[in-house]
Amino acid sequence: SDQEEVVKREIGRAAARILSRLLGDGKKHIVAVSGGTTMAALAANISGSHPQTVVVPARGGLGDNVELQANTIATVLAQRMGASYRQLYVPDSVSEEILNSILAEDTGVKAVVDIIKQADILVHGVGQAAVMARHRRMAPEFIQKLLDDGAVGEAFGQYCALDGRQVYMTNNAGLMLQDLPKIGTVIGVAGGRSKAEAILSVIRASRQDILVTDEAAAHCIAEMLED
């Protein structure tokens, strides 16, 4: 809806301000970013000059919409602040076998993954489990099973239940929820009442230093925490 678009824009703008502040210390940073519409709003609103920063996608590609892929968002973000960037060309949700052979044989991919693993700032969106599963063109009966197993939220191709349990994960190169404790600053960027459960599931599944959200989602999360 139009209201959702406004919320995404505002959240993206707020997250851009926070990121600019973090990068303003003049140090060299590696920033990993995920894909999605809210993250695209962040990239569109970033300002300042940070030539010593390197921006990388948190994971490989997802879906057909190139504008919303992490690679594209990393590029736009870097170009808007005079930073450098790397791209990761690994298809989303390949078999573990194919993924391992890509990582073993493609030194370019391996080099980018190594940089991603050194990120000291991560900015990521949060998806609703059913919506993200449809984006990944999962079979309807598989999506139903995910939901029956309790999946409500998704980040980094990992599907989480409301209690933070990990229900399912897709194979991909890059960051996973398990990597988050090693990263200096983790910023989640998501809002809207419809995403409240998803946000809480991902926070519980990993760790979050800063959550940029809106009042509707925040109220909803607060209510769930009181229950």
Report the location of each language-model feature.
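Short Gly/Thr/Asp-enriched flexible loops that form oxyanion-binding sites at enzyme active sites
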Residues: 38-52, 134-143
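Short, contiguous clusters of charged residues that form electrostatic/catalytic patches at enzyme active sites
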Residues: 9-17, 37-40, 107-110, 114, ...
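HTH-adjacent hinge/linker in prokaryotic transcriptional regulators
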Residues: 1-32, 44-51, 65-67
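Glycine-rich beta-strand-to-loop/alpha-helix junction loops that act as flexible
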Residues: 32-38, 191
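Catalytic or ion-translocation cores adjacent to nucleophile or general acid/base/metal-coordination motifs
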Residues: 52-62
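Conserved phosphate- and dinucleotide-binding cores of soluble alpha/beta proteins
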Residues: 61-227
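A short acidic, glycine/proline-enriched capping/turn motif at secondary-structure boundaries
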Residues: 3, 38-39, 62-63
